[in-house]
Regions:
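Short, small/polar-rich motifs associated with maturation and membrane association
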Residues: 1-252, 264-266
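Catalytic cores of large soluble enzymes that bind and process phosphate-bearing ligands
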Residues: 14, 18, 205, 209, ...
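Proline-centered flexible-loop/turn and helix-kink motifs
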Residues: 26, 31, 292, 296-300, ...
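Short secondary-structure capping/turn segments at boundaries of alpha-helices and beta-strands
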Residues: 93, 214-215, 335-337, 356, ...
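Short loop/turn positions at the edges of beta-strands in beta-sheet-rich folds
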Residues: 98-100, 259, 342-344
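Residue-level signature of outer-membrane beta-barrel architecture
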Residues: 108, 219-221, 257-258, 269, ...
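Surface-exposed loop/interface segments of Gram-negative outer-membrane beta-barrel transport/assembly proteins
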Residues: 113-196, 233, 237-333, 349-430
């Protein structure tokens, strides 16, 4: 092996860090390995990049778990024994074209021979909060900026006089009790909003909550070793109503048996079941886009019309009244391995992997009403409600066969390796 290789001390990387997946465990611990979360939504995958986004196609590295491709986020971090990162394109000589952007090699924990059953339980609980949010211009700063823009006749887009608006805001700042609702209609029916509101705080809870639990038992006899593990991860996001959340259950089992001196059989079974609820994008620019683009004077309080109280046109309304998208995934992987050592220095390994992934994706846009931006009337979030359901599965089969022969001639140590790989993947969705 030539080229840049980095190893990760998984115990130090995990420590007491509150993480939900392996991506978070590797974030910031390997120089040159860039791992980013583009959404912050609980359960969303992170993106990987080893040589930078300016590399050809900006591709992601190949991830191998016990020598077989697998979704890195379906592994319980507590099941990992070691992680190695092959950073340069030389790894393609061993793993093929898919490794052109690097390789992440993950080895999971196994039992040890001649060891009494050992039980282990880990947990951690943590809270999350948005640390940095965009700072918006105050209502007065916004109106003064409108004046500097030089609107024709000192009139803003919806017909209100900008100088008059400035006067209302200054009076509101001096005498807020005169404007209990934070807005006023003039004699011509023009609406002047004056109160400064925090769109982000309106749509977020004080904290998000995360918990991880992991239980395992391992051991072995003179000729066998085993390890069983069960893990649970739960994360509630920071949006109101807790509609952004993620739950995952991991189970794994490993068994190794020395049938005789030259034959060893191994069976590795892994299963993961996850459910992700994520807020659908609503409003003119999506939930986060609306919170960012709407001015700070935008009303967030409900408004009564015809004796009925309706919510305002805000991101918080889209979150509270909208239905979340539900994504359910199952991932079952079975790996069987036979290791034969017929001669001194010769080891022949045969592997068969079966992986089945199922996915359920439900999107429902329900219909609800809210008050428009300038209290001009009732609006519908959609003309008609929508429902979409996508279900699918992927079956993956792989065969690996390789042999290593190590021998010495004089003062020279020689190692010869040859291998064969065959993969088949079949995917259906409807």
């Amino acid at each position: 092996m030539t080229g840049a290789v980095a190893s990760v001390n998984i115990k130090e990387s995990l420590g007491d860090r509150p993480i939900t997946n392996v991506s978070a465990a590797l974030q910031g611990v390997v120089p040159g390995l860039k791992i980013e979360s583009t959404t912050g939504t609980p359960g969303d995958d992170m993106t990987y990049n080893i040589r930078g986004t300016t590399s050809i196609n900006g591709g992601e590295p190949l991830v191998l778990v016990n020598n077989v491709p697998m979704d890195i986020n379906m592994i319980d971090p507590q099941d990992i024994e070691s992680v190695s990162i092959l950073k340069d394109a030389a790894s393609a000589a061993i793993y093929g074209a898919r490794a052109a952007f690097g390789v992440i090699l993950i080895t999971t924990k196994q039992g040890k021979k001649d060891m009494a059953p050992r039980f282990n339980y880990n947990n951690n609980f943590s809270f999350s909060k948005a640390s940095e949010l965009p700072q918006k211009a105050s209502p007065l700063e916004s109106v003064l900026a409108y004046k500097e823009m030089g609107w024709a006749n000192d009139t803003y887009v919806d017909g209100k006089n900008i100088t008059q608006w400035e006067g209302y805001i200054r009076d509101y700042q001096a005498n807020p009790s005169n404007y209990p609702n934070g807005y006023i209609f003039d004699d011509q029916g023009n609406l002047f909003l004056m109160r400064e509101n925090d769109m982000f705080a309106d749509m977020m809870d004080n904290f998000g909550f995360m918990q991880n639990h992991s239980f395992s038992v391992s051991g072995g006899s003179q000729r066998t070793s085993y390890r069983l593990s069960l893990g649970y991860t739960g994360e509630d996001g920071i949006l109101v109503t807790d509609k952004d959340k993620f739950d995952r259950i991991n189970m794994s089992s490993f068994l190794s048996v020395d049938v005789n001196k030259w034959l060893t059989t191994q069976l590795d079974i892994r299963y993961a079941n996850s459910t992700q609820n994520k807020v659908e994008q609503g409003g003119r620019n999506g939930v986060w886009g609306s919170a960012m683009h709407l001015p700070s004077y935008h009303n967030i309080l409900p408004y009564e019309q015809d004796g009925i109280e309706y919510p305002a046109e805000t991101s918080a309304t889209f979150v509270r009244y909208g239905e979340p998208r539900v994504i359910k995934k199952t991932n079952l992987r079975t790996l069987g391995r036979v290791i034969i050592s017929p001669l001194k220095g010769l080891k022949i390994t045969g592997e068969y992997t079966y992986n089945r992934i199922t996915e359920y994706n439900r999107m429902y846009v329900n219909k609800y009403k809210y008050i428009g931006f300038n209290f001009t009337g009732l609006l519908n979030n959609v003309e008609n409600s929508r429902y979409a359901l996508t279900q699918g599965f992927t079956n993956y089969n792989a065969i690996n066969a390789f042999a290593n022969y190590d021998f010495s001639i004089g003062k020279h140590d020689i190692s010869i390796m040859g291998g064969y790989n065959q993969e088949e993947s079949h995917k259906e969705s409807q």
